[in-house]
């Protein structure tokens, strides 16, 4: 085996990540449609300490970790610092977890987050794919799940946006398999299973600052799990993996989260309006609880509508099951509705 043969093997077998082309109305990556608040940008820049820029900064910093503990704690449950760690975006966390558990049987339930497939091929993992039965997990096909298995599950699901039921989540947890619950869109659904880490040592919850907090460019993710899992993850992940400025922006966002909660409310209102409008047009729309809507379409119809939207300067995400449309600002959503009305 030579290095050149390794290079060619990767080029042949590892799928490259590709995003949709940028257009004026870009609704393909579930980005927050509102700019990061200017007053908070100013606060972040005022807080930058030039003496810290040449140094390696702990990730997470003590201040950021304290804010995360406060934010993650919910109801009567109080998280501990040792139950949280961070990543350069949730994607890095997923990549590291796939690397950690690559020798186990790893399961995904298509349609699901496309990067599971991409990252798995990159680290040499063969995924076990058990397609959803409609929008439900086919539990009858998972009777052999045990502690030799790892399940990656977005909740709300991506690309469909629907929530899985308590029964499905608990069946997976009670199987003994490690459940990596990807809560990237948690803030738009209001449902989390994070407190269950106290009862289930086989649960990891992964989240991001990219969606609800509008910090996709800063690459900030975090995970919540029992202390043993977090300790193992910290030994595998890269040191200093989250930048000083990224942590600063995330810390300021958490300290001012009421601003973002108001924006989330607006996005949820627009999501429901968009879902209703598309259903009135006759589309089969999932009951999304994320910051996007999903329209079930066959390949031919999805291609036709995708192309027509592009001609109007609107980019959405085309998948093998239909179109995923990120919720934009009101005028962007109006443009989508108007364009689709013209196609029907």
What are these regions (language model features)?
Residues 70, 167, 307-344:
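PLP-dependent enzyme catalytic core of the Aspartate aminotransferase-like
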Residues 36-37, 202-279, 283-286:
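PLP-dependent aminotransferase class I/II
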Residues 100-119, 126:
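Conserved PLP-anchoring active-site segment centered on the Schiff-base-forming lysine
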Residues 81, 286-292, 318-322:
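Short Gly/Ser/Thr- and Asp/Glu-enriched loop/turn motifs at secondary-structure junctions
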Residues 79-84, 183, 201-202:
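Short acidic capping loops at alpha-helix termini that bridge into adjacent secondary structure
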């Amino acid at each position: 085996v030579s290095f050149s043969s390794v290079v060619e093997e990767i080029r042949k077998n590892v799928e490259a990540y590709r995003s949709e082309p940028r257009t004026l109305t870009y609704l393909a990556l579930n980005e927050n449609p509102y700019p990061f608040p200017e007053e908070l940008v100013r606060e972040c820049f005022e807080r930058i300490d030039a003496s810290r820029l040449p140094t390696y900064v702990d990730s997470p910093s003590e201040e950021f970790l304290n804010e995360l503990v406060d934010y993650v704690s919910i109801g009567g449950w109080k998280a501990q610092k040792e139950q949280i760690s961070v990543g350069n975006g949730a994607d890095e966390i997923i990549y590291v977890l796939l690397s950690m558990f690559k020798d186990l049987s790893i399961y995904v339930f298509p349609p699901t987050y496309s990067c599971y497939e991409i990252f798995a091929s990159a680290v040499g993992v063969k995924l076990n794919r058990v397609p959803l039965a409609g929008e439900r997990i086919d539990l009858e096909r998972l009777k052999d799940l045990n502690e030799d298995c790892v399940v990656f599950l977005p909740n709300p699901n991506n690309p469909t946006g629907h929530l899985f039921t308590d029964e499905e989540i608990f069946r997976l947890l009670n199987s003994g398999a490690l459940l990596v619950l990807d809560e990237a869109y948690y803030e738009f659904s209001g449902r989390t299973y994070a407190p269950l880490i106290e009862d289930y040592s086989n649960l990891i919850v992964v989240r991001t600052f990219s969606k609800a907090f509008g910090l996709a460019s800063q690459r900030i993710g975090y995970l919540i799990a029992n202390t043993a899992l977090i300790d193992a993850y910290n030994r595998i992940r890269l040191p200093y993996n989250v930048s000083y400025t990224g942590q600063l922006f995330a810390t300021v966002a958490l300290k001012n989260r009421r601003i973002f909660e108001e924006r989330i409310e607006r996005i949820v209102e627009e999501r429901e309006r968009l879902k209703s409008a598309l259903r009135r047009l006759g589309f089969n729309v999932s009951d999304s609880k994320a910051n996007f809507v999903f329209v079930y379409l066959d390949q031919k119809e999805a291609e036709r509508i995708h192309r027509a939207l592009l001609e109007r300067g609107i980019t959405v995400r085309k998948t093998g099951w239909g179109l995923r449309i990120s919720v934009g600002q009101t005028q962007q959503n109006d443009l989508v509705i108007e364009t689709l009305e013209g196609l029907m």
